Regions:
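AMP-binding/adenylate-forming core of the ANL superfamily
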Residues: 170-182
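Glycine-rich helix-loop-beta junction characteristic of Rossmann-like nucleotide cofactor-binding loops
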Residues: 39-43, 105
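Short Gly/Pro-enriched turn/cap motifs at secondary-structure boundaries
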Residues: 160-164
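AMP-binding/adenylate-forming
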Residues: 25-32, 48-103
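Conserved AMP-binding A3 loop
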Residues: 8-35, 42
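Conserved S/T- and glycine-rich ATP-binding loop of Class I adenylate-forming
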Residues: 13-16, 49, 64, 94, ...
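Gly/Ser/Thr-rich phosphate-binding loop
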Residues: 108-157
Length: 182
């Protein structure tokens, strides 16, 4: 789909907040999201990344788009609950869901920067991450925002209690009390 002449792609939501559905998104928006992630985490051409989530959902798809757009080296492993098992090389950037993070905690020294999305990270797990050398960020986002729009560092000297909007993203509440993301 990425190399098709169409300006849009179909992505599928996971159904975490209701029934799974298909949505159309512009490739330009996907490129913008990839570049925002690259700028936020200081990714540069040749950095190594890990795809350990299914490509049928936005998180996996966006890891591929980031690699293509930013010139990153992409290592692909079968999605599993312990994706770092069998990885011998150092990974500069990876994305996981909380269960993958929990099952990989003893191998996180293989990853420089890790983002975690798809669900809240348990406070007990966050406590276990405090001496891990990896920079670990919980993300806030959804398929409709093409992954994360806010991050919260979970460990290290810059850890935070609150999510911070990424550069150029801001939030407001509308008349109905609903969150609006710009």
């Amino acid at each position: 789909d990425w190399y098709s002449p169409n300006d849009e792609m179909t992505l599928h939501t996971s159904g975490s907040t209701g029934s799974p559905k298909s949505i159309q998104v512009k490739k330009e928006w996907m490129r913008n999201s990839a570049n925002l992630t690259g700028n936020t985490f200081g990714l540069k051409e040749g950095d190594s990344t890990l795809l350990c989530m299914p490509m049928k959902y936005v998180a996996g798809t966006m890891m591929v788009v980031r690699a293509l757009e930013l010139g990153l080296d992409l290592t692909i492993v079968e999605p599993s609950s312990n994706p770092l098992e069998g990885i011998s090389e150092q990974i500069d950037f990876a994305a996981m869901v909380p269960i993958q993070l929990e099952n990989s905690i003893d191998q996180l020294d293989k990853v420089k920067t890790l983002i975690v999305g798809g669900g809240q990270v348990d406070p007990k797990l966050i406590k276990r991450l405090q001496n891990v050398p990896t920079d670990i960020y919980e993300t806030y986002g959804m398929t409709e925002t093409l992954t994360h729009v806010a991050i919260k560092q979970l460990n290290g000297s810059n850890k935070s209690k609150f999510f911070q909007a990424l550069d150029g993203v801001h939030f407001e509440v509308d008349d109905r009390g609903c969150l609006v993301i710009h």
